[in-house]
A protein has these predicted regions:
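Hydrophobic/small/kink-forming positions within alpha-helical transmembrane segments
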Residues: 14-19, 49, 73-81, 103-108, ...
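C-terminal-most transmembrane helix of multi-pass membrane proteins
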Residues: 244-314
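Loop-to-transmembrane-helix transition segments
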Residues: 5-12, 52-53, 58-82, 146-154, ...
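Hydrophobic transmembrane alpha-helices of multi-pass small-molecule transport proteins
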Residues: 121-137, 154, 261-280
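Transmembrane alpha-helical segments that form core, pore/gating elements
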Residues: 22-25, 33, 48, 140-201, ...
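C-terminal transmembrane-helix exit sites in multi-pass transporters
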Residues: 85, 102-124, 244-263
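Helix-helix packing/entry segments at the starts of transmembrane helices
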Residues: 96-101, 168-183, 220-251
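Transmembrane alpha-helices of multi-pass small-molecule transport proteins
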Residues: 30-78, 157-160, 180-196
Length: 314
């Protein structure tokens, strides 16, 4: 039953991540982006810090790699601002689908940034995946908007976060990497909103802000638990249930209906992403895979697998 339990935890994590996106889209209809990023990050960070004892206390945040963490905080801010800016201005399913190009970008970036070898099959999958992006954006159709570019920029930032996590994984704990990429967007949004007049949330607004912060933590915990109990090659396909949930929610809440090009492009991106996962991690260590992806800054990508915390964070 461990696999069934892992799939259940994964689905909880995925749905919580989708809940975060739904809260964000609703919040951004009324409140400024920088206010949302700040309060969402503040609430999420407060919850994470309350769990510090489970990860070795605040001593787990000690680091000598401040330059790397500064870079990662900027990348995390770019990822969060880019994704939520775009999602607020385009159909939910379109934004989620474009966001799933991050694993393809990570594969491509691993060659120049890490010197890794990527075989022709994975390169073909990457090219096919970006062909799916072109199907969604349809150059010349007017679908290439600044919002779409912002989401792709966010996916690029997520990919860079994953690459830098690979560089830092031998010396930095997963908890440390996660905390700093939550604190980064909060700091950047605080600077950007300095002197601005924030809208005081009403009761419904505070509920949405709290739900957004809680959903981000539940997503992280659910995915962490899932990848402790089953391999990425088994669980990865279930992450794409976010697209099904996003399509249903977009239709029911905002009357958004994806056209045939978005559906076709999504299928190509999903197929390419799954192929890359199976080729890259099918026979690799789940610990290595998890330590790489966890610190990408996206709760929906947070993964860890191992027998003991010391094995993971040592």
């Amino acid at each position: 039953m461990p696999v069934a339990r892992a799939i259940g935890l994964l689905l909880i994590g995925v749905m919580a991540g989708l809940g975060l996106d739904l809260c964000a889209k609703a919040i951004l209809e009324t409140y400024p982006l920088e206010q949302f990023v700040f309060l969402r990050s503040l609430i999420g960070l407060s919850i994470f810090l309350s769990l510090a004892r489970q990860f070795g206390g605040l001593a787990a945040l000690a680091t000598r790699k401040w330059g790397w963490h500064l870079l990662r905080t900027l990348l995390a801010a770019g990822a969060m601002f880019g994704f939520f800016y775009g999602m607020a201005r385009m159909p939910l399913i379109d934004a989620l689908t474009l966001g799933f190009t991050a694993p393809l970008m990570m594969t491509a970036l691993s060659v120049p940034m890490l010197g890794e070898h990527v075989g022709w099959r994975r390169w073909l999958a990457v090219v096919a995946g970006f062909g799916g992006v072109l199907m969604i954006l349809r150059p010349g159709s007017g679908a290439i908007t600044f919002a779409a570019v912002a989401v792709l920029f966010a996916a690029f930032c997520y990919a860079c976060l994953a690459i830098t996590a690979r560089r830092l994984a031998p010396t930095e704990s997963t908890y440390c990497l996660s905390i700093y990429v939550i604190a980064g967007p909060m700091a950047v949004s605080g600077v950007l909103s300095a002197g601005a007049t924030w809208q005081v949330p009403d009761t419904a607004g505070w509920i949405l802000f709290m739900l957004a912060g809680i959903c981000s933590v539940v997503a992280w915990i659910g995915l962490v638990g899932a990848y402790r109990q089953a391999s990425p090659s088994i669980l990865a396909p279930f992450e794409y249930t976010a697209l099904i949930g996003g399509a249903i929610a977009g239709y029911l809440i905002w009357d958004e209906v994806p056209d045939r090009w978005v559906v076709a492009g999504a299928l190509v991106i999903i197929g390419s992403g799954l192929f890359v996962v199976y080729r890259e991690v099918g026979g690799a260590s789940s610990i290595r895979y998890l330590r790489t992806i966890t610190a990408s800054g996206s709760a929906s990508l947070a993964r860890r697998f191992g027998k003991t915390r010391s094995e993971l964070d040592g």
